[in-house]
Amino acid sequence: RLALAQLPAATEIGRNARQALHLAERTRDDGGAFGLVPLLEHRIVDHVYSYGIAAAETVPVALALAVAAGGSPAGAVPAAACLSRVADSAPALTGALTGALRGPAAVPESWRQACRTLSGCALPWLAGTDLVELAGRLVPGDGGTPGG
């Protein structure tokens, strides 16, 4: 609900966010985040205008899926990937929101390990870079969070 205060009601993103959260609350006990996917697909995601990364769709979808999954990254992120028009942006934003809500321990260990070390695909000189170690060097005094 705090997010809605930042989204003006008279804007596309504000209207979509309010509708998406209403859908999430209405269908909370009806399949969780995955049960919400068809509703978001048809009521929030625009299938005419072909700019699927628009914030007016991605932000509401991420908010609604986070609510429907009870803040669980494992419940919300895969559902976000099922919305084809926003699949390039919604999973990342949904993961960021649920991670911020629940903390790093809520992210499944298998996900953390799969994403921890860079393969160097786009930037070969970064192959083998451990992102947790790098984060520990960037945040003074933290020293890295084990398993984070």
What are these regions (language model features)?
Residues 1-84:
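Accessory "access/gating" subregions that flank catalytic or transport cores
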Residues 54-144:
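Catalytic phosphate/nucleotide-handling subdomain of diverse soluble enzymes
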